[in-house]
């Protein structure tokens, strides 16, 4: 397979495997679980634990404590520039603020904003998606779930008109004037896309200018920055920020344009619990206020329930099952859906 055809999670696993192949006895891993599905994350952590038993030293920087703590020999917390050794792990987890609870879905019209009929897509000589049938309803929060490489990001790109299907048809019902095929400037005024890599869409010299670029007013840009907890970063250059901060800025900048359809690809990577809480509250506040439609791709169990009215499970390029929030529990449990 060509590396350009790999999913974000597969690329993450490839990079980590390349680092392990160097056989260096000291390994420094910065958020190695980013974009990994639950089985990939568990396999990686078990592999790293095996290496430590062979004399390797492994240092991991990670926000997803529930996946890391069972494998860690020591835990250190960086707070206000100082390292503190954590001996009470239960207290550490208890101190983490819980992610936002799912808000009750408002009564919504069963009105489609987009339909996909028999959609397929090929890249690098491989079939990535095949026979995808899906309806996205106006005002809903739809979650796309599945293992790494199953086609979630590819499906999101087709919905965003960043690529065209090689089979089947995608129809939009946002506005007839937008047509059915091209991703025009007018299209992207109504449809917001947040990529896996925030570096791909941060281009202004300051955070304030980034958020204000597509906002209807300076006051609204300021409101968005307050919602996403990034006011204190206003004068910073976006590319000088941490990955988690970049992620919040990129989402805030797209949200400031008030899109009717918001497509999010792994929006919570790099977020600590407080950042996660702020991000989810901001997204759901805007969703309730504007009635926008949100489609999210995620492997992060912490956020899934708060961004889901309905979920679709993908396997090997096909939608295997759709359901409500109960599908989230199946996806992270031992259900046969996996």
What residues fall within each predicted segment?
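Conserved ABC ATPase signature
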Residues: 2-6, 237-241, 245
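Hydrophobic anchor residue at the start of the ABC signature
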Residues: 16, 251-252
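ABC ATPase C-loop
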Residues: 20, 254-255
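Catalytic Walker B motif of ABC-type/P-loop ATPase nucleotide-binding domains
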Residues: 27-30, 262-265
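H-loop/switch region of ABC-family ATPase nucleotide-binding domains
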Residues: 62-63, 298-299
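Helix-to-loop junction immediately C-terminal to a conserved catalytic motif
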Residues: 160
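ABC ATPase NBD Q-loop/coupling interface
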Residues: 169-186
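Conserved ABC ATPase "signature" region
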Residues: 219-233
């Amino acid at each position: 397979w060509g590396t350009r055809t790999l999913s974000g999670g597969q690329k993450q696993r490839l990079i980590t495997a390349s680092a392990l192949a160097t056989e260096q006895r000291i390994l420094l891993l910065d958020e190695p679980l980013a974009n990994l599905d639950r089985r990939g994350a568990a396999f990686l952590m078990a592999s790293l634990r095996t290496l430590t038993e062979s004399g390797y030293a492994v240092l991991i920087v990670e926000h997803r404590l529930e996946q890391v703590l069972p494998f860690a020999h020591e835990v250190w917390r960086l707070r206000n520039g100082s390292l503190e050794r954590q001996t009470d792990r239960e207290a550490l987890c208890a101190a983490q603020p819980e992610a936002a609870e799912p808000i009750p879905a408002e009564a919504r019209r069963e009105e489609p904003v987009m339909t996909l009929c028999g959609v397929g897509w090929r890249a690098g000589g491989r079939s990535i998606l095949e026979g995808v049938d899906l309806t996205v309803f106006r005002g809903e929060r739809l979650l796309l779930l599945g293992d790494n490489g199953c086609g979630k990001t590819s499906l999101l790109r087709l919905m965003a008109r960043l690529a065209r299907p090689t089979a089947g048809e995608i129809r939009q019902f946002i506005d007839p004037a937008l047509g059915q095929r091209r991703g025009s400037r007018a299209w992207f005024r109504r449809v917001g896309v947040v990529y896996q890599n925030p570096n791909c869409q941060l281009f202004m010299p300051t955070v304030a200018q980034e958020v204000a670029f597509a906002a209807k007013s300076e006051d609204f840009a300021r409101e968005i920055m307050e919602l996403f907890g990034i006011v204190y970063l206003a004068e910073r250059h976006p590319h000088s920020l941490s990955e988690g901060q970049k992620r919040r800025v990129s989402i805030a900048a797209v949200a400031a344009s008030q899109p009717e359809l918001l497509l999010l690809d792994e929006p919570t990577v790099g977020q600590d619990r407080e950042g996660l809480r702020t991000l989810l509250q901001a997204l759901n506040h805007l969703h309730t206020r504007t009635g926008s439609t949100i489609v999210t791709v995620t492997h992060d169990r912490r956020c899934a329930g708060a961004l889901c009215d309905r979920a679709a499970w993908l396997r090997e390029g096909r939608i295997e099952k759709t359901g409500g929030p109960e599908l989230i529990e199946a996806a992270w449990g031992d259900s046969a859906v996996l």
